[in-house]
A protein has these predicted regions:
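C-terminal, well-structured catalytic/ligand-binding subdomain of enzymes
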Residues: 1-72, 87, 105-157, 161-402
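Conserved, charged/glycine-enriched, solvent-exposed linker/hinge segments
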Residues: 65-68, 72, 76-99
Length: 402
């Protein structure tokens, strides 16, 4: 068991130590791509990443402390690792759309907001984790997130204020822009600072208006849902920002997928996390490039403790959805180091995957009930213990059966 609570230096050292093989491999692949396909030297990459460094220095300087510790622990040069972070996504330094949706209000079985994203991208090892960075004077909000093992960008998340979000490619941008912060880091900034959909929208607007956001030649769909029961989709190109969908009672879809709306509407009024997981495996939703998926159930009363997320690391029809609560301090190392992702590359049957998920869900429901009881009597540490058994049990079941 490990904890991602601590100073940026501590968190960076731990991340770099655990995932050093993937970091070295992916940085090397990035440098070879730059050199062999784009004719760019290491010095040019470093120079082109200066704007990224400046934006991070302004918005979230603790990220630099974390990434420098990652580079040291992994044994890669700091400036090259920063260039990797700046240019890894959408080829920012080299001048697939995902699927996100949310259900709020009477659309869900118990009124708790639901959020989901299927991430379709290169099939790299994935991590699922809770992070709480301790920075004097800043107090970043703790969050659960999914992303690559080789960097700390956030692909989909939910934070302790009860805000869930994602940032997906949204078709061509007629006015490409490369000199800024990619959306995985914009989403991390939102995870650490925003409390609801309104604040998330204002941060997206600020980054766009000030030229801090760089989406290369693709526009972005930002999808958010919060504990208040609001869900929005924001279309963001470099010349246009518009809320394209908003709901306080019903569904929002960042994009239409064959069979998706119909599947969700079939269970409208009774939607559960299991329905979101099922929808992620629909033929019209599940892409060959699907490398991870996240379903979130936001607890509106105690989001910092009882909000739960389930992640499938790897293609969703071959991966188990593993649960994790925001109220934990520790989590299995296998959630972080690519082990769960590796399970998805084994020839396990859909029936076995369903069985593991069902067993884990029975234990999770019991553990959450015990945690709620403990919280009513002000036994927060007892509640945390019950919630931490959820990921432990799911990991043990996977190790036993997969």
């Amino acid at each position: 068991m490990i904890t991602l609570t601590g100073t940026p230096e501590h968190l960076g050292h731990l991340w770099g130590e655990i995932n050093h093989v993937d970091i070295v491999t992916h940085v090397d692949e990035f440098l070879k791509l730059a050199r062999n396909h784009h004719g760019l030297s290491e010095a040019t990459l470093i120079e082109r990443s200066r704007r990224y460094d400046e934006v991070v220095g302004e918005l979230a300087p603790h990220w630099h402390l974390e990434s420098e510790a990652i580079a040291r622990a992994a044994g890669v040069e700091r400036d090259l690792y920063h260039a990797f972070l700046a240019g890894k996504y959408r080829g920012l330094l080299f001048a697939g759309d995902c699927t996100s949706f949310a259900a709020v209000g009477s659309a869900t079985a118990d009124g708790r907001p639901l959020f989901h994203k299927n991430r379709d991208n290169r099939m790299r090892p994935q991590a699922f984790y809770r992070k709480a960075t301790e920075v004097f004077g800043l107090d970043p909000i703790p969050y659960l997130a999914v992303g690559d093992t080789s960097d700390t960008g956030v692909m989909m998340m939910v934070n302790a204020e009860g805000l869930a979000g994602s940032a997906d490619m949204a078709g061509p941008d007629a006015d490409p822009y490369y000199d800024g912060l990619m959306n995985p880091y914009g989403l991390r900034h939102i995870a650490e600072t925003a409390r609801d959909c309104g604040e998330a929208l204002e941060i997206v607007r600020m980054m766009n208006d000030r030229g801090l956001y760089a989406g290369a030649d693709s526009a972005t769909n930002w999808t958010f849902a919060d504990k208040h029961g609001t869900a929005i989709v924001i279309y963001n190109s470099h010349r246009r920002l518009q809320v394209t969908s908003r709901a306080c009672d019903g569904l929002v879809l960042a994009c239409e997928r064959e069979g998706l709306r119909e599947r969700l509407e079939t269970s409208l009024g009774d939607l559960t996390p299991a329905d979101c997981n099922d929808a992620s495996r629909l033929p019209g939703v599940l892409a060959t490039e699907n490398c991870s998926s996240l379903t979130v159930q936001i607890d509106p009363d105690q989001p910092e403790t009882l909000t739960c997320a389930w992640a499938a690391l790897g293609n969703a029809d071959r991966a188990v959805y593993f649960p994790l609560y925001l109220g934990v301090e520790t989590l299995p190392r296998a959630y972080l180091d690519g082990t769960l992702f590796a399970y998805s590359h084994r020839p396990d049957s859909a029936a076995l995957i369903a069985s593991v998920e069902a067993d884990s869900e029975l234990q999770r429901v019991h553990a959450e009930a015990e945690a709620r009881t403990a919280l009513t009597t002000n036994h927060a540490l007892v509640a945390r213990h019950h919630l931490e058994t959820v990921a432990q049990y799911a990991r043990a079941e996977a190790e036993k059966h997969l």
